[in-house]
Curated annotation (Swiss-Prot):
GO terms for biological process: translation. This is Large ribosomal subunit protein bL34. Transmembrane segments: none annotated. GO terms for cellular component: ribonucleoprotein complex; ribosome. NCBIfam families: rpmH_bact. It comes from Thiobacillus denitrificans (strain ATCC 25259 / T1).
């Protein structure tokens, strides 16, 4: 059986990257929440 997680840097950046987050209102909320919490890494 093939595993579900087949890592791809491109897909990872496109779906969870900083620019992808900034595109939507909800994504910006995620970034702001992580900033408020003091996360060292805001996005992938």
């Amino acid at each position: 059986m093939k595993r579900t997680y087949q890592p791809s840097t491109v897909r990872r950046k496109r779906t969870h990257g900083f620019r992808a987050r900034m595109k939507t209102k909800a994504g910006r909320a995620v970034i702001n929440a992580r900033r408020a919490k003091g996360r060292a890494r805001l996005a992938v």
